[in-house]
Regions:
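N-terminal pre-domain/capping segments
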Residues: 1-91
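Active-site acidic/histidine proton-transfer and metal-coordination neighborhood
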Residues: 67-121
Length: 121
């Protein structure tokens, strides 16, 4: 049975007894795409050389979506993630931030949308 879906496995959560690069190779050998988290701690050239299909990665280094200052930082570091995503052939950056303001309450969507629209440009 074939599927139109790409199934991906988070390399941060499986085969934890293996070094990260070996996890990626194993996931790829099993026919799955790969997701990664903090790219700043990874050998990007080695990951790209595995031939694995990367479908998602954390798309920022620091920042948060719950306030102006944090969102500006998130967007600034998201820009640094773009060339890494290109190097991996990865089409998706996950900008989850915290989704909360500094009081621990859900942030207002009307605040978040303009922030994310700036990044899309």
């Amino acid at each position: 049975m074939s599927s139109n879906f790409t199934l991906a496995v988070c390399s941060e959560m499986v085969f934890l007894d293996l070094p990260h690069i070996e996890r990626v190779k194993k996931i790829h050998s099993l026919g799955f795409a790969v997701e990664i988290w903090d790219w700043t701690q990874k050998d990007i050239a080695a990951l790209a050389a595995t031939g694995a299909k990367f479908t998602s990665m954390t798309g920022y280094i620091t920042g948060r979506l719950g306030d102006q200052e944090g969102a500006a930082e998130l967007l600034r570091t998201a820009e640094q993630s773009i060339p890494i995503a290109h190097a991996l052939g990865n089409p998706s950056l996950n900008l989850h931030g915290t989704g909360l303001d500094n009081k621990g309450l859900p942030a207002q969507p009307c605040f978040l949308c303009p922030m994310l629209q700036r990044f899309r440009k």
